[in-house]
Amino acid sequence: MLKSVTDIKRGMFWRLLVGTLVWVIAQLLGAYGYMSVTLGFLVGIVGWLYIIGELYMGDAGRSNASCNNESVQMAFFANRLIITIGFSIYHIGYFNEHLAGGANINSLNIIYNLADILNKIIFGMIIYSAALQDTKKRDSTNEV
């Protein structure tokens, strides 16, 4: 999203990918018993917090702040909230399933399905909306 309208540092993608892999792999290893579920949870939280730090205070946040495209800034802000709030649902589900004494499988399915709706469908709709807004602005300036 930012790459399309501003110059970003090359390592940003890799840092976000590493944070994501740390989060997902740690919690997967904890869930499958290859490491302590508590350690998997904590390391996963560290990976997620690293992603959030990159989005708020790292190169991604700085690139967005210097971007002059309102549509991209709106989409970045909304998606950053989704990553902050929406991704926490996965941690809540992991905690409920593995650390809080277990949870009803139907409740977990509802939790994870709501997280997927928020984190995948709405995420994509925000990007689509920003692209439409940007296209409309570009078309209106070309007509003048």
Annotate each PLM feature.
Residues 1-144:
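Polytopic alpha-helical membrane-helix bundles and their juxtamembrane interface segments
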